[in-house]
A protein has these predicted regions:
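Short acidic, Pro/Gly- and aromatic-enriched capping/linker segments at domain boundaries
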Residues: 21-39
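Phosphate- and other anionic-substrate recognition elements at nucleic-acid/protein interfaces
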Residues: 44
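Terminal leader/tail segments of proteins
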Residues: 20-26, 84, 247
């Protein structure tokens, strides 16, 4: 596997004809999440059960945060985000992660070649949206770019709604078409800001690898818990522990 700086995470594999690269590599995801012992998706992501996700939804951010903090997971919360629906709904689902950086011609050509070899079509944001499934939440590091950094607009938000049913996205960057998106009832988006410009001048550097959203770190398969402008990323292997802890009496604030 190849790391270039903090953001480029492309896996190298080997065949008789030589070296080649891939995004969203199962073996990499397995290495990143060894503490998860349960069911997994075909791509290797931890698959926390629907039942456990439903139980998490009953908890407050503070209940979850306390268990994370006690286990030294102190970089799991980000609050400097906007959200589409200003009501009491929660966004909870399994993370699909992606990261991007400003484009440059040689790197863009390399990434395009990788994507085409994997059958990916369209722009690099579409590569992620197209593959989302029920209950997924896209967690996207767009390097806080808002102007020309609009990861989704109305059409891709509709696609997220169709693919995930109850999911959404957390975007460390921009979105557009907020009037149209706000009318999609079964989706929730957290984002840095909105702008009417279309997305451009960006290139994918990782897909289902570790990403950063502000002060928080997310791995593929983490459970995303969003409420009122704040988002927690819950390691899959801690979900059972958090649910058990929530049933114990607590008599003081930390």
């Amino acid at each position: 596997m190849l790391y270039l700086s903090n953001t480029l995470y492309i896996s190298f594999k080997y065949q008789e004809e030589g070296e080649y690269m891939h995004f969203n590599v199962k073996e990499d995801i397995l290495q990143l999440t060894p503490l998860w012992k349960g069911e997994r998706f075909e791509d290797g992501r931890p698959k926390v059960s629907d039942e456990d996700i439903a139980e998490l939804k009953k908890l407050t951010q503070e209940q979850i945060w306390e268990s994370l903090w006690e286990n030294d997971y102190k970089n799991q919360f980000e609050s400097h985000l906007m959200q589409i629906h200003e009501d009491d709904r929660k966004l909870i689902g399994r993370a699909v992660t992606a990261a991007y950086i400003p484009s440059r011609p040689d790197l863009f050509d390399v990434v395009e070649e990788i994507g085409h070899s994997e059958g990916r079509k369209g722009t690099h944001n579409l590569w992620v949206v197209d593959k989302l499934v029920d209950g997924d939440v896209a967690v996207v590091d767009m390097y806080d770019k808002v102007y020309e950094g609009t990861f989704v607009g109305g059409n891709l938000s509709t696609a997220i709604s169709t693919n995930t049913k109850t999911g959404g996205a957390v975007v460390g960057g921009g979105i557009r078409d907020i009037e149209q998106i706000s009318k999609i009832d079964n989706i929730e988006l957290y984002y840095r800001g909105n702008d009417p410009t279309p997305i451009k001048d960006f290139v994918m550097t990782s897909y289902n690898a570790p990403v950063r959203i502000g002060a928080a770190v997310c791995l593929p398969g983490d459970i995303v818990y969003g409420y009122k402008g704040g988002v927690l990323f819950i390691p899959a292997h801690l979900v059972k522990y958090i649910l058990a802890q929530s049933k114990k009496p607590h008599v003081k604030d930390i």
